[in-house]
Regions:
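Active-site cofactor/cluster-binding pocket
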Residues: 4-146
Length: 146
């Protein structure tokens, strides 16, 4: 199922968060063109914009942010589970941010799916997460970051 115009904001900090809204995010994850166009103007200068392989970066796009392309759709399709592109992107974000260990993120992800009664996806989710996590390293080494 695809939810059109859906989005999610995640805000985390070592200290208490008094205002959960995020007017100027440091990181944007955009998996489609409408999300990219809508939220790119909000990213702080110097921020990171993680985009999926279905997003087109126009020539006149902002130059004051770092773009990282993750071929999440391609990876998830190659793994035989095209619906796991979001999990691939999660692995990439965890690697880029460096704020959580890979193991802690996978444990939290598995716990969330278990609570939803979807533990049967554990192996596929871990495989997708690992692929996204590893893709970032390859991209940085290959200078695919714009």
């Amino acid at each position: 199922m695809c939810i059109r115009d859906s989005n999610c904001t995640v805000k985390y900090c070592e200290n208490t968060i008094y205002n959960p809204s995020q007017e100027e995010p440091d990181v944007l994850l955009a998996m489609n063109n409408p999300s990219f166009k809508k939220f790119l103007p909000l990213v702080t200068p110097g921020g990171i914009v993680v985009i999926g392989d279905l997003v087109d970066i126009p020539e006149d796009a902002r130059k004051d942010v770092i773009y990282v392309r993750v071929p999440a759709t391609e990876i998830s399709t190659d793994q035989g589970n095209p619906k796991s592109a979001n999990i691939v992107m999660t692995g990439a974000i965890v690697k880029l941010m460096g704020d959580f260990s890979k193991e802690a993120a996978i444990t939290a992800m598995n716990h969330m799916f278990e609570k939803k009664g979807k533990s049967q996806f554990r192996e596929a989710n871990e495989k997708a997460f690992d692929a996204g996590y590893d893709a970032v390293e390859v991209m940085v080494q290959d200078s695919c970051v714009r």
